[in-house]
Amino acid sequence: MKSLYIKTYGCQMNVYDSILMENIIKPLGFNVVNDVEKADLVILNTCHIREKAAEKLYSELGKIHSSRKNKEITIVAAGCVAQAEGEEIFRRAPFVDIVVGPQSITTLPELIVKASRSKGHVINTDFPKVMKFDRLSDECYGNSQGSSAFLSIQEGCDKFCTFCVVPYTRGAEYSRPVNEIFREALKLVANGAKEINLLGQNVNAYHGEYEGEVWDLGKLISHIAKIEKLERIRYTTSHPRDMHESLYLAHAEAPKLMPFIHLPVQSGSNKILRAMNRKYTTEEYLEIIERFRKLKPKIEFSSDFIVGFPGETEKDFEGTIKLVERVRYAQAYSFKYSTRPGTPGAERKDQVPEKVKTERLLHLQKLINKQQLEFNQSMVGKTIPVLFSNKKGKHQNQIIGKSPYMQSVCIDDPEDKCRDKIVNVRILEAWQNSLLGRELQE
């Protein structure tokens, strides 16, 4: 039997795609290994969001080729960098056999066979009219992912933010039918999932078909919540423009829906938001936050921020700081703006100096870290439900789980009783990125 190794970069959608690729390829006679040195087929499933993504791919490809150049191996470049770079990958890394975009991964079996027969380069970066989900059998979905599972419900993006390549690498927005999603959710729960994370590039833009109707995300969540042994539901990533009434109500009425929303704002300046083509204002964003908090007082938020977008002044940046101070995030992710070839932001002449971007990022991160630590410290002395997987902690007998607010929670579990269970935990200590607790015996 041949062996398959997949390295995944980037977002949860890529993790889900890697799981799909495993399930697609295993019937060809492959077993999955965790060591690239033992693999006959190597797939790098890439992400194009962050700076120098293409260079990181070429560097990794070079390392693999150098270490395996005397052994027969098939190398596949997959994901969003593969979509963006296309044939250029073969020019810069001629030892790569296959290039496949994220919407074409279902064609991998044919591409692998074709590459083995021709001993030449094979590429598929099409956006097929038949979506990738429609090409797959039920056997490719819902296989065991442990106690917490990913389920893709929506792909692509129609927003065209001026800093982002996703519309060009993932294509137009597409929503899977309700029944297809529900079948996969049932199968995931039957295979041990207690929590399902609903995924989409703009997950709250979901508009799936159900018996001649169009359902939004809130209605879908209420439907999935009926699955008896499913205990938790999450969704990511949402866009402020796509918030809708039934999603507000789902947070108020569905106990299984976790009280935590990742809602990227990117900037606290209306001028910069217009330049980014985000199509909402800071005032509208804050109205969304307040509406959720009124309906669900214990709800918490995380967000994404880009500092140093072209044209950002000190006043614009201060707007971001004021917004963070007002919202008080449980978590947040912040990055310096980096140009993406082919996006409108890359063409602008008013780029912010790198030194200024670095200074602003450090200022913002200091505030975000302070808020995150304070939120974590507010948990000390409380008892919270924690979902544990098989993730081990730094110390012997220690296991790590997730709180409803996505905090990492460590406890001692010498008898391995808590794995794949939701356990009530008393929080004893808190740090920047984790909590320490002890299991409360029933």
Curated annotation (Swiss-Prot):
- What binding details are noted for the cofactor? Binds 2 [4Fe-4S] clusters. One cluster is coordinated with 3 cysteines and an exchangeable S-adenosyl-L-methionine.
Q: Give the chief site where it resides.
A: cytoplasm
- Which InterPro entries does the record cross-reference, listed alphabetically? Elp3/MiaA/NifB-like_rSAM (IPR006638), Methylthiotransferase (IPR005839), Methylthiotransferase_CS (IPR020612), Methylthiotransferase_N (IPR013848), Methylthiotransferase_N_sf (IPR038135), MiaB_methiolase (IPR006463), rSAM (IPR007197), rSAM_horseshoe (IPR023404)
Chain positions recorded as [4Fe-4S] cluster 2 binding sites:
C157, C161, C164
Q: What Enzyme Commission number does this protein have?
A: 2.8.4.3
Outline the extent of the Radical SAM core domain: 143-374
Q: Which residues bind [4Fe-4S] cluster 1?
A: C11, C47, C80
Task: List the catalytic activities from the record.
Answer: N(6)-dimethylallyladenosine(37) in tRNA + (sulfur carrier)-SH + AH2 + 2 S-adenosyl-L-methionine = 2-methylsulfanyl-N(6)-dimethylallyladenosine(37) in tRNA + (sulfur carrier)-H + 5'-deoxyadenosine + L-methionine + A + S-adenosyl-L-homocysteine + 2 H(+)
Q: Which GO terms describe its molecular function?
A: 4 iron, 4 sulfur cluster binding; metal ion binding; N6-isopentenyladenosine methylthiotransferase activity
> Among the entry's GO cellular component annotations, what is one?
cytosol
Intracellular or extracellular location(s): Cytoplasm
The protein's UniProt keywords, in alphabetical order, are: 4Fe-4S, Cytoplasm, Iron, Iron-sulfur, Metal-binding, S-adenosyl-L-methionine, Transferase, tRNA processing
Start and end residues of each MTTase N-terminal domain: 2-117
Q: Which NCBIfam families match?
A: miaB-methiolase, MiaB/RimO family radical SAM methylthiotransferase
| Subunit and partners | Monomer.
Q: What does this protein do?
A: Catalyzes the methylthiolation of N6-(dimethylallyl)adenosine (i(6)A), leading to the formation of 2-methylthio-N6-(dimethylallyl)adenosine (ms(2)i(6)A) at position 37 in tRNAs that read codons beginning with uridine.
Q: Which HAMAP family match?
A: tRNA_metthiotr_MiaB
Q: Provide the protein name.
A: tRNA-2-methylthio-N(6)-dimethylallyladenosine synthase
What organism is recorded for this protein? Wolbachia sp. subsp. Brugia malayi (strain TRS)
Q: Which gene encodes it?
A: miaB
